[in-house]
C-alpha cells in the first residue's frame, strides 16, 4: 500500500473546512501514512469564506494557502502539483463531500502505478431537498440526468472521455509530464483536454468506485453563465475535442444531414 500522500484542494469562494476535517480524520487513522493537506485558494473574493478557511491551519499537516497569481484554472492546478511535497497526489474539489469512510484507503490500496491516473468518480446527493432541487435547480437536474454515466462500468468503457479532475489520484510525474493545458483561459473543458492529452501521451486512466458527492448546487443564473463560458471554450478548441464532446458529435451529425440551418433558425427565433 502507498504510504505517502499530498492532498491538493483547489479553493475559490468555497469553504473547504468540512472536507479537510474529514480527510484529516481519515489520514490520521491510517498507520504509517505520511501526508499533507493543502487547500490552495486561487483568489477568493468572499472575505467570510477566507476567514473560515483559515481554521484549516489549526489542523496538523494541513495548510490554507492563498495564491492569487494564476491567469487560468489550468495554471493554478499545475502549480498545485508543484507545491505537493510527496510523490503521490490526490486532487479533489473543495465543494464536494466524501461518500466512503475509507475514501483515502481505497486510493492508497488501489494498486496505482506511476504512469496512470486513478479516478474515483462523482455522485449526486441533494439530501432532503432532492425533490425541490430537481424542480428548481438546473445544475442538480443536469447532474441527476448524468448520474447513469457515473458508474465504474460505464466510465471504464471510455476511460479517457469519462476522465474528470474533480477527484483523481496520481503520481506527481503524471502531471509533470502531461500538465493541464494552460491555453484554456475561460471556464470548462480543462478535464476533457487533460484526458485527451493523457491518451495521446500513453498515460493510463483507470476508474474505481470511490466517488465524491455533489451536495451544493449553484443558482440557475450562475450555472447558465458557466455553461456559456464553457461553450466558448468548446468552440475555441472544437478541432481538438471533436471525439470527446457529445455536443460536437451532434453538430457533426446535423452538418452531415444538412440540418444546421434549422438550429440557426431556432436560435434566431428564440434568442431574442
Task: Name these PLM-found stretches.
Residues 14-28:
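Short, well-formed alpha-helical segments that are part of the catalytic scaffolds
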Residues 102-134:
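Conserved donor NDP-sugar-binding/catalytic core segment of glycosyltransferases
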Residues 138-160:
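Short, flexible, basic/aromatic active-site loop/helix in glycosyltransferases
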Residues 186-194:
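Acidic donor-binding loop at a coil-to-helix junction in glycosyltransferase catalytic cores
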Amino acid at each position: 500500500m502507498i504510504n505517502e500522500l499530498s492532498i491538493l484542494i483547489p479553493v475559490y469562494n468555497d469553504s473547504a473546512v468540512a472536507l479537510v476535517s474529514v480527510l484529516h480524520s481519515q489520514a490520521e487513522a491510517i498507520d504509517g501514512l505520511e501526508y499533507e493537506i493543502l487547500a490552495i485558494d486561487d483568489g477568493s473574493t468572499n472575505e467570510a469564506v477566507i476567514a473560515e478557511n483559515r481554521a484549516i491551519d489549526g489542523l496538523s499537516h494541513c495548510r490554507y494557502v492563498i495564491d492569487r497569481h494564476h491567469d487560468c484554472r489550468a495554471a493554478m492546478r499545475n502549480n498545485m502539483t508543484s507545491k505537493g511535497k510527496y510523490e503521490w497526489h490526490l486532487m479533489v474539489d473543495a465543494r464536494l463531500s466524501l461518500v466512503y469512510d475509507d475514501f483515502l484507503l481505497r486510493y492508497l490500496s488501489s494498486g496505482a502505478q506511476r504512469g496512470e491516473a486513478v479516478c474515483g468518480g462523482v455522485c449526486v446527493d441533494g439530501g432532503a431537498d432532492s425533490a425541490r432541487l430537481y424542480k428548481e435547480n438546473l445544475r442538480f437536474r443536469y447532474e441527476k440526468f448524468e448520474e447513469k454515466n457515473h458508474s465504474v462500468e460505464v466510465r471504464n468503457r471510455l476511460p479517457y472521455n469519462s476522465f474528470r479532475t474533480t477527484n483523481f489520484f496520481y503520481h506527481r510525474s503524471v502531471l509533470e509530464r502531461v500538465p493541464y493545458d494552460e491555453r484554456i483561459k475561460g471556464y470548462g473543458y480543462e478535464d476533457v483536454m487533460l484526458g485527451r492529452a493523457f491518451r495521446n501521451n500513453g498515460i493510463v486512466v483507470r476508474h474505481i468506485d470511490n466517488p465524491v458527492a455533489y451536495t451544493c448546487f449553484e443558482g440557475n443564473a450562475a450555472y447558465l453563465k458557466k455553461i456559456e463560458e464553457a461553450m466558448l471554450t468548446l468552440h475555441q478548441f472544437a478541432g481538438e475535442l471533436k471525439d470527446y464532446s457529445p455536443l460536437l458529435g451532434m453538430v457533426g451529425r446535423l452538418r452531415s444531414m444538412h440540418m444546421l440551418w434549422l438550429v440557426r433558425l431556432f436560435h434566431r427565433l428564440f434568442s431574442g
